[in-house]
């Protein structure tokens, strides 16, 4: 069969390479790099696969010189020693730094392969004159499998020292023999077979390499999780150094802000009469309001002085008619009443408990309320949550994801049951998938006068101008139907209920200043909200989450201890970096740890490299549009204009606004610095609405996250520093390899400008139909082609993904990878590098249950093996490089290969 022929051809080529490699070493012996025992053992263990072996620290410790092993090799040598691959010398030493004879290396390789069924004989064993009797069986096995050919003179150079180059050739051949997936069967599985064998999993597994599925356990792995773990480890180490005074930093840096805020958080319960008086004064403004006008005035004054709006959620939203950023406005949800009432089962299970918690909190404040007023406050919370239905669904999904992380007993049946119950109660959720391709609904925009006319007893224009918004002529409702539903909320009859909700909102918005008793009750309220979306009992959720956070802190301590085993973490450091303190820091300053990472680990030269790649990809898109054979000239020019106007922010934003955090030594406190943070949040929203460039220069998420995104309403892309790590971006890799990975990501994000959703926005990010009627009709047909094309690829045998849900991501994937190959041109080696780096980037292992779960199958992204295999089948070079023939599962006839632009 053709597939076997491909494997034999590959093996023969590698064998030939080994034979030929002997001669250069004869003439350049002084340049030969010989391999040490620790290097050889580690390479062989990785070739066979770490997941096939189990290590034991105890067994390794029985060798007297185990402490001489380099840290990077310890884990692999532990596994090799436990499996008997390396057995040491009679004097109980391993001699890890010594060079290794070829015969010794070959025997270790044979031992690695003892429990592997994938190494099969392809020829008769070769008889070598210099192989000792004790090694004959092992060498016969290797030579029969075509892994050892010797020097061609009847010897194998048994006593010669093995070189690094020869070790690499042996591992390459072993990898080829162990790779049970052919490129014509699953390119994703073919490229990532070795990665799957070496993924960092906790126990031995059975892996379906074709799909990247674990059959026997629930661990998961991907390069993205590896990068996340590496970034997190670096951040934890920085935090320990920072707190212990071992990190130098400048005033105004993320390190300075984090350090001084942590010191304030750590001393949050220190007595400060001035802070207490100020904190209570804002609370008194609420409780002492006797009329609705006084209440609104109090809310506005608090907003002006603290940046906290107790009635409204104010954000920056684009005006779809003008492209300008305007204040987005909706009533604040004021608590958990909305999400509890969204689910009848949650209402039944948590409704009364929630109201009782509010009552208990008010009693602690010394502001008792009747049951009827609390009931009215709850009803107002329901009303003010109008328009948040989709947000609640997202919260449920993220809640269940959180549960899967913190709850060892989590099972997917529980998750599916919760989501199915929601869908049954809210059938409109079934239509969500159609929103990925539906025409965006026209946006409602209100003049200030129109907004004031909807809601009684509030002057929205004055409220905004008083805090610094200027030249505001209109506002954008950020939640559909929200303002209209709340038109009668601000009435005298609701005054007490509004004050209850405002007190609750105040406590939740600024915990600084609250007593421990107040905080404990607020935490119960927060845990109840989390219980709703995770399906856990509130106490159980609190217990699991606390344990998870403590483990994160312990990981930080372990990282620091590993840096120098003679040092221990200072008890004060452990206290300052406690789970509670770190959670509060993250809540208050969600971007600062990401900026801390960038300050110490982001290579500034990367920005220019990635920007050049962005420019190259934009040029490739423009050429595609110029040469497009189905778009009218007018539509082509509109598309080209849009590409030219795409802006990019790379790594992190240098324009992001941050608060001045005042050190404790200069009078800074937990409360006053928290107010500075809240005021800065407001300042950022004002800047987004008032400075036309600012919104394009900032990022909407922390730069350490492994992500990139396109914003259709801004027509810009952001490539975050967290994703600019190997193997997604490797500064030492070739341009072609990086194009296949981070280049494909960039091209994907630009592709979103022209997917089923992004294509509805023009070059200014305005919702505007720039298509001719005929072109729009063809574009719709193209979308159906994507649905049909992706339906042929399986997530796992017998299971396909809903390609209607994933259509926008699939369109961006295909358009992106095809632009990448336009840039590469006809260079076969570069094409091969790009294809394999693309597949490598998306390597992921998940359980077969996870891969086929309803949650994943409804993800807007195709599962990783589908997005790789579907994309590469659209590239003609793929078929030529890997000899993909008709009849192979990966084969698609030329006329059926997907093409968008």
Identify the role of each PLM range:
Residues 45-53, 81-85, 110-118, 144-147, ...:
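Sec-exported extracytoplasmic/periplasmic mature domains
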Residues 587-590, 594-901:
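Intrinsically disordered, low-complexity linker/terminal regions across diverse proteins
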Residues 205, 254-257, 367-379, 394-398, ...:
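Short, glycine/acidic-rich hinge or "gate" loops at secondary-structure transitions
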Residues 229-608:
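Noncatalytic, helix-rich "gating/capping" subdomain that lines the substrate-entry/channel surface
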Residues 182-186, 190-265:
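Active-site-surrounding "flap" and adjacent substrate/cofactor-binding loops of secreted or lumenal enzymes
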């Amino acid at each position: 069969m053709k597939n076997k022929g491909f494997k034999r051809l590959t093996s023969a080529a590698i064998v030939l390479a080994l034979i030929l490699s002997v001669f250069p070493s004869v003439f350049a012996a002084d340049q030969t790099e010989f391999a040490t025992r620790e290097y050889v053992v580690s390479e062989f263990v990785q070739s066979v696969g770490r997941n096939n072996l189990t290590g034991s620290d105890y067994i390794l410790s029985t060798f007297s010189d185990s402490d001489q092993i380099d840290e990077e090799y310890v884990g692999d040598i532990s596994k090799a020693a436990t499996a008997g691959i390396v057995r040491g010398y009679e004097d109980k030493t391993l001699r890890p730094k010594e060079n290794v004879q070829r015969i010794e290396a070959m025997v270790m390789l044979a031992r690695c392969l003892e429990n592997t069924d994938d190494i099969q004989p392809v020829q008769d064993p070769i008889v070598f004159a210099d192989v000792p009797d004790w090694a004959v069986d092992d060498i016969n096995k290797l030579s029969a499998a075509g892994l050892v050919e010797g020097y061609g003179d009847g010897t194998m150079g048994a006593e010669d020292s093995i070189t690094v180059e020869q070790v690499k050739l042996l591992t390459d051949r072993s990898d080829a023999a162990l790779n049970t997936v052919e490129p014509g069967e699953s390119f994703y599985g073919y490229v990532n077979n070795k990665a799957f064998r070496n993924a960092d999993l906790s126990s031995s597994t059975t892996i379906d390499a074709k799909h990247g599925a674990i059959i026997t356990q629930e661990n998961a792995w991907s390069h993205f999780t590896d990068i996340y773990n590496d970034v997190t480890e670096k951040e934890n180490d920085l935090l320990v150094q920072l707190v212990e005074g071992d990190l130098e930093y400048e005033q105004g840096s993320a390190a300075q802000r984090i350090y001084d805020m942590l010191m304030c958080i750590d001393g949050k319960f220190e007595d400060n009469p001035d802070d207490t008086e100020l904190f209570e004064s804002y609370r008194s403004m609420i409780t002492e309001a006797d009329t609705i006008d006084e209440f609104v005035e109090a809310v506005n004054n608090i907003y002006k002085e603290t940046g906290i709006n107790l009635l409204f959620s104010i954000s920056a939203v684009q005006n779809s008619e003008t492209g300008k950023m305007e204040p987005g406005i909706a009533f604040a949800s004021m608590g958990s009443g909305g999400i509890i009432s969204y689910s009848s089962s949650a209402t039944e299970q948590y409704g009364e408990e929630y109201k009782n918690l509010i009552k208990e909190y008010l009693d602690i404040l010394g502001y008792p309320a009747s049951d009827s007023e609390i009931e009215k406050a709850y009803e107002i919370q329901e009303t003010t949550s109008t328009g948040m239905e989709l947000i609640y669904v997202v919260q449920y999904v993220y809640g269940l994801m959180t549960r899967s992380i913190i709850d060892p007993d989590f099972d997917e049946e529980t998750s599916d049951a919760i989501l199915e119950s929601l869908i049954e109660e809210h059938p409109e959720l079934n239509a969500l998938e159609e929103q990925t391709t539906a025409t965006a609904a026209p946006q409602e925009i209100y003049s200030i006068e129109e907004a004031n006319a909807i809601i009684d007893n509030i002057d929205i224009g004055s409220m905004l101008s008083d805090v610094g918004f200027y030249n505001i002529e209109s506002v954008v409702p950020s939640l559909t139907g929200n303002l209209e539903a709340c038109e009668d909320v601000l009435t005298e009859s609701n005054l007490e209920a509004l004050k209850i909700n405002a007190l609750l909102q105040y406590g939740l918005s600024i915990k600084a200043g609250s007593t421990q008793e107040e905080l404990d009750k607020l935490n119960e309220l927060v845990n109840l909200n989390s219980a709703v979306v995770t399906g856990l009992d509130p106490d159980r959720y609190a217990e699991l989450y606390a344990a998870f956070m403590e483990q994160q802190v312990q990981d930080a301590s372990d990282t620091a201890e590993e840096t120098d085993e003679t040092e221990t973490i200072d008890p004060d450091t452990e206290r300052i970096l406690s789970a509670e303190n770190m959670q509060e820091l993250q809540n208050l300053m969600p971007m600062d740890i990401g900026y801390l990472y960038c300050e110490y680990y982001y290579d500034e030269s990367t920005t220019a490299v990635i920007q050049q790649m962005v420019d190259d990809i934009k040029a490739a898109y423009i050429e595609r549009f110029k040469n497009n054979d189905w778009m009218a000239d007018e539509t082509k020019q509109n598309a080209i204009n849009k590409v030219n106007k795409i802006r990019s922010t790379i790594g992190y934003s240098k324009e992001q606004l941050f608060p001045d955090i005042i050190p404790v030594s200069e009078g800074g406190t937990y409360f006053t610095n928290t107010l500075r943070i809240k005021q800065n949040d407001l300042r950022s929203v004002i800047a987004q609405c008032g400075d036309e460039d600012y919104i394009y220069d900032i990022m909407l998420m922390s730069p350490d996250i492994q992500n990139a995104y396109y914003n259709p309403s801004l027509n810009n892309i952001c490539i975050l520093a967290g994703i600019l790590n190997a193997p997604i971006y490797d500064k030492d890799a070739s341009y072609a390899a990086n194009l296949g990975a981070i280049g494909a990501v960039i091209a994907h994000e630009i592709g979103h400008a022209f997917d089923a959703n992004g294509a509805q926005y023009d070059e200014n990010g305005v919702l505007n139909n720039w298509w001719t009627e005929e072109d729009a009709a063809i574009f719709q047909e193209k979308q159906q082609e994507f649905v049909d094309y992706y339906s042929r690829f399986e997530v796992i045998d017998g299971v396909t993904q809903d390609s209607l849900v994933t259509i926008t991501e699939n369109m961006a994937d295909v358009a992106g990878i095809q632009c990448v190959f336009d840039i590469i041109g006809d260079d076969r080696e570069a094409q091969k590098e790009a294809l394999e780096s693309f597949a490598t980037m998306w390597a992921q292992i998940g359980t077969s249950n996870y891969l086929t779960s309803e949650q994943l199958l409804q993800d807007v992204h195709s599962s990783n093996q589908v997005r790789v295999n579907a994309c590469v089948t659209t590239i003609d070079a793929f078929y030529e490089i890997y000899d993909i023939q008709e009849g192979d599962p990966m084969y698609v006839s030329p006329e059926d290969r997907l093409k968008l632009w």
